[in-house]
Amino acid sequence: MGGRIFPPSAAFFCMKKIRLATRSSPLALVQARMAAEYLGARIPGAEFETVEIKTSGDRRQYWSLEKFGGKGLFTKEIEDALLSGAADIAVHSAKDLPTECPGGLEIAGCLPRDECADTLVMRSGVQVPALIASGSPRRRAQLKKMFPQSVWTEFRGNVHTRLKKLAGGAADASVLSQAGLLRLGIGSFEGVEFRVLKLDLCVPAVGQGIIALQCRSADAPALRPLTHGRTNEAFALERKFLSSLGGGCQSAYAANFDGNVFRIFHEECGFRKIEFPENSGLGERLSEVGKLAAGLAGEASGARG
């Protein structure tokens, strides 16, 4: 979809209202409010309007994300709203973003990262789950080591819907992001129990726990300085790994930068982690991550023969 010609980025801060495009799920709306509060504290006098958009992924609840993939299913219509001028900033769960933006759009930056770990949700009373519901190849590949005898299935829906299905016996366990539960204020839920998984046990998805802000390229220079530098660096490193390795959410690999430690998982190569020196710069770290991804791709190719 083509876009209109927009004024210089300085006009970004002269808008009477800044329109935030977001999905319409309860979690997405919470994240949009978080973005409005964060930006409102940094743009004096700014007012915000939420533009709710149903994406292809929201409309096609019967689709299997494992079969059809997830990258782009939850972002395209939101990006179209930016390009058409119907919105000014898109608020995304960073883990939903493809590695490349459409022409004319950029990821300006991120809000401070929340907890990035996965949470294992078990039906109360279950010790070893016979049936685990997750459509994520990444989660399945890592948790099969914990539960080798379990059968895997998939159910979709927002967080509350999934928890209700689980408590009602649709499965014995599922996996949700810790950040999503925290943002929704869910510390407990009748009929299920929560267990946060250590990062070395289950490496999170690229961008998990991050709220990313996307805008038109002309507005990015004005918006970028307001975003969170440390989180921007983490997201850049994780996306570098993803783009260097290739693939979308159907591929069973993961990357996470936390502290100075970069953790990765590859289904054919296993778990790895490297610790960067405190004084290393982003350019050096990006180079190391690119080399790591290239090495893993070669190792996986060799293993397949």
Language model region names:
Residues A94-K95, C101-S150, D200:
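A conserved helix-loop-strand patch within extracytoplasmic ligand-binding domains
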Residues W63-D88:
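Short, structured active-site "lid" loops
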Residues M1-C14:
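N-terminal amphipathic/basic-hydrophobic helices that include classical n-h-c signal peptides
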